[in-house]
């Protein structure tokens, strides 16, 4: 809104980037008004692009530009991962999740799923991220009898995040739509986990299916379905070969479809054209 008002005051064109919450919790009339007024808009998922195009009088203004990863600034992935299969109590499978402790991340559903895992499987869960539901989630883990297996690391610097990705065996994100309509787009952490060589279990929420294809480069279950999530986790825990297969395919998907460079190049080109157009108009 501030950019739009400043542009109107100066008589300049303006552009906008929409992500997730701003798409799904904004009033449709407000989004439509801004889309009619801007020069162009970008968003980071096809699902979001379709929503904005439906609201825009000029659907061609809305472009899909995935965030992607800047591979040059990421640590090299681990070449060898432990082949834990959950059979050794002294060497449990490490399950990692990263994200804010808020409703749309589905951590309550994930704890329910972990509690449903077969007693014969040995695992431990690590979580990275801050958030308003921290105390509630810890209390839930206590009630479910899994608190001793759960480590809540809180917010961590990037170096520690990638260290956690390196030591984990499996990444899980149980995203869902929150009661207020907020939902994820395509969480970057999924692409980061894949780049680091981790296999992924997630949900069909939001735009996750634009990256993870169930049964090809990971496993997806319906959002909020703790029993299905537990079954997918158990399958991954007990089959290190399957984890390796999915991890390899997910990493290839990241490398071939989700490079940071393509999106930056498009945005730079569009901004450059706007500047040149204004310069010609001022002559």
Identify the meaning behind each predicted range.
Residues 26-30, 53, 69-86, 90-91:
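Acidic anion/phosphate-binding donor-loop and adjacent secondary structure
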Residues 47, 68:
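Carbohydrate-associated surface elements
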Residues 86-105, 111-114, 126:
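Conserved donor-binding/catalytic core segment of Leloir-type glycosyltransferases
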Residues 136-159:
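Nucleotide-activated donor-binding/catalytic signature segment of Leloir-type glycosyltransferases, i.e.
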Residues 166-181, 198:
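Acidic donor-binding loop of glycosyltransferase active sites
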Residues 190-195, 199-202, 212:
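Short hydrophobic beta-strand element within catalytic cores of glycosyltransferases
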Residues 202-215, 219-220:
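Short acidic/histidine- and often glycine-rich active-site loop of Leloir-type glycosyltransferases
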Residues 214-215, 219-226, 235-241:
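Conserved acidic donor-binding segment of nucleotide-sugar-dependent glycosyltransferases
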